[in-house]
Amino acid sequence: MSAKTYNAGVKEYRHTYWEPHYNVQDTDILACFKIVPQPGVDREEAAAAVAAESSTGTWTTVWTDLLTDLDYYKGRSYRIEDVPGDDSSFYAFIAYPIDLFEEGSVVNVLTSLTGNVFGFKAVRSLRLEDVRFPIAYVKTCGGPPNGIQVERDILNKYGRAYLGCTIKPKLGLSAKNYGRAVYECLRGGLDFTKDDENVNSQPFMRWRQRFDFVMEAIHKAERETGERKGHYLNVTAPTPEEMFKRAEYAKELKAPIIMHDYIAGGFCANTGLANWCRDNGILLHIHRAMHAVIDRNPHHGIHFRVLAKMLRLSGGDHLHSGTVVGKLEGDREATLGWIDIMRDSFIKEDRSRGIMFDQDWGSMPGVVPVASGGIHVWHMPALVTIFGDDACLQFGGGTLGHPWGNAAGAAANRVALEACVEARNRGVPIEKEGKAILTEAAKHSPELKIAMETWKEIKFEFDTVDKLDVAHK
């Protein structure tokens, strides 16, 4: 073996980190970045710079490179592709050896792949489009505490999507009035109600009182309906210690499900809470507050499909996933792609949906996608078509805004859902025949009839900002 020599100075990244003939290993973590390089920086150099800064490199040669096998540990940019319809950017595919990352640590993966490299001057903008986690790494992560099938068995609910509702107004209610709103929704036919993501423990409603009144409402609704009910008690807190304190109290009250804001609260806290839920048999609902700050810019940040993969590794039984048809951002094909990423055991590369790699989850349980944001009964046929049964459809204003009150709003949604599921099971194309299906069901449900009249003119027809690159052609 020849002796290594140290040559001080600065050299182009491509000489070390650009390897177009690299043979990708089954154990490599693969990343696809969309890069807009600075003027004068060519594609190979920009891609190699990203590989270097997100793995072993720095701005100059250092003598301590000789103390390790740099060729083994470095990231490698192995392929470059054009972005359809965008001449300013390109895709760079980078392979990282699995030993660069701590086992079971989403925090460590994000620190490397989305750390200092995103402020690197060699690139004008940078976006992490997708990541392939090898099964060898997936197996080191805990994943969802319970999973889709276990949740079905806990709740004894099968053959349809769950129905939920975020209590409104999101802020300002007293704990007792909050509990009253929960009870009305649950007795009307919903499966779940939810704390809004910014409901923590404010002066108008401290967390302990909220938990008490909500659980009283749940138990009362369960006795009256004979169904299991739940409310996503938000345990997100200023510190991990306080978060676990709230989770323990929810357990004392026999709450079936709790909630965490996983991006604002952080992946370290989220993984710890997921482990706690797994040990204690409690479902974990995950809200994605702050995601659009990170994923909405089509040229810089992290695509939501990556955030969804990170959540599945970190742990959560539900995750907000957009609606396609509601008030929030979400391209239809891209949304269908990350819904599959959340639920399925194996997902094949599919550029038409923005999926850049095959992803094998092995036996890791799936995550229930949650559709929430500006939806109402008229959206039900599309939602059932898009999301299927293993989903939770959450109607906040679409429940609480009913002219006859919360219980009537809940009943309208339940009738609409069951009518669509029954029609689908008969082979009816429900998205095409949705109006007829709902109109027929409304003949036997005055609550649904009023809901349809109330929201018949409500649409959110704004164009999607973050379009799939294939749609740019």
UniProtKB/Swiss-Prot annotation:
<keyword id="KW-0503">Monooxygenase</keyword>
<dbReference type="GO" id="GO:0016984">
    <property type="term" value="F:ribulose-bisphosphate carboxylase activity"/>
</dbReference>
<feature type="modified residue" description="N6-carboxylysine">
    <location>
        <position position="194"/>
    </location>
</feature>
<feature type="binding site">
    <location>
        <position position="372"/>
    </location>
    <ligand>
        <name>substrate</name>
    </ligand>
</feature>
<dbReference type="InterPro" id="IPR036376">
    <property type="entry name" value="RuBisCO_lsu_C_sf"/>
</dbReference>
<keyword id="KW-0113">Calvin cycle</keyword>
<feature type="binding site">
    <location>
        <position position="196"/>
    </location>
    <ligand>
        <name>Mg(2+)</name>
    </ligand>
</feature>
<feature type="binding site">
    <location>
        <position position="170"/>
    </location>
    <ligand>
        <name>substrate</name>
    </ligand>
</feature>
<dbReference type="InterPro" id="IPR036422">
    <property type="entry name" value="RuBisCO_lsu_N_sf"/>
</dbReference>
<protein>
    <recommendedName>
        <fullName>Ribulose bisphosphate carboxylase large chain</fullName>
        <ecNumber>4.1.1.39</ecNumber>
    </recommendedName>
</protein>
<comment type="subunit">
    <text>Heterohexadecamer of 8 large chains and 8 small chains.</text>
</comment>
<keyword id="KW-0560">Oxidoreductase</keyword>
<dbReference type="Pfam" id="PF02788">
    <property type="entry name" value="RuBisCO_large_N"/>
</dbReference>
<dbReference type="GO" id="GO:0019253">
    <property type="term" value="P:reductive pentose-phosphate cycle"/>
</dbReference>
<feature type="binding site">
    <location>
        <position position="197"/>
    </location>
    <ligand>
        <name>Mg(2+)</name>
    </ligand>
</feature>
<feature type="binding site" description="in homodimeric partner">
    <location>
        <position position="116"/>
    </location>
    <ligand>
        <name>substrate</name>
    </ligand>
</feature>
<feature type="binding site">
    <location>
        <position position="320"/>
    </location>
    <ligand>
        <name>substrate</name>
    </ligand>
</feature>
<feature type="site" description="Transition state stabilizer">
    <location>
        <position position="327"/>
    </location>
</feature>
<dbReference type="InterPro" id="IPR020888">
    <property type="entry name" value="RuBisCO_lsuI"/>
</dbReference>
<feature type="binding site" description="via carbamate group">
    <location>
        <position position="194"/>
    </location>
    <ligand>
        <name>Mg(2+)</name>
    </ligand>
</feature>
<feature type="active site" description="Proton acceptor">
    <location>
        <position position="168"/>
    </location>
</feature>
<keyword id="KW-0460">Magnesium</keyword>
<dbReference type="InterPro" id="IPR000685">
    <property type="entry name" value="RuBisCO_lsu_C"/>
</dbReference>
<dbReference type="InterPro" id="IPR033966">
    <property type="entry name" value="RuBisCO"/>
</dbReference>
<dbReference type="GO" id="GO:0004497">
    <property type="term" value="F:monooxygenase activity"/>
</dbReference>
<dbReference type="InterPro" id="IPR017443">
    <property type="entry name" value="RuBisCO_lsu_fd_N"/>
</dbReference>
<comment type="similarity">
    <text>Belongs to the RuBisCO large chain family. Type I subfamily.</text>
</comment>
<keyword id="KW-0456">Lyase</keyword>
<keyword id="KW-0120">Carbon dioxide fixation</keyword>
<comment type="function">
    <text>RuBisCO catalyzes two reactions: the carboxylation of D-ribulose 1,5-bisphosphate, the primary event in carbon dioxide fixation, as well as the oxidative fragmentation of the pentose substrate. Both reactions occur simultaneously and in competition at the same active site.</text>
</comment>
<dbReference type="InterPro" id="IPR020878">
    <property type="entry name" value="RuBisCo_large_chain_AS"/>
</dbReference>
<keyword id="KW-0479">Metal-binding</keyword>
<dbReference type="Pfam" id="PF00016">
    <property type="entry name" value="RuBisCO_large"/>
</dbReference>
<dbReference type="GO" id="GO:0000287">
    <property type="term" value="F:magnesium ion binding"/>
</dbReference>
<feature type="binding site">
    <location>
        <position position="166"/>
    </location>
    <ligand>
        <name>substrate</name>
    </ligand>
</feature>
<feature type="active site" description="Proton acceptor">
    <location>
        <position position="287"/>
    </location>
</feature>
<feature type="binding site">
    <location>
        <position position="288"/>
    </location>
    <ligand>
        <name>substrate</name>
    </ligand>
</feature>
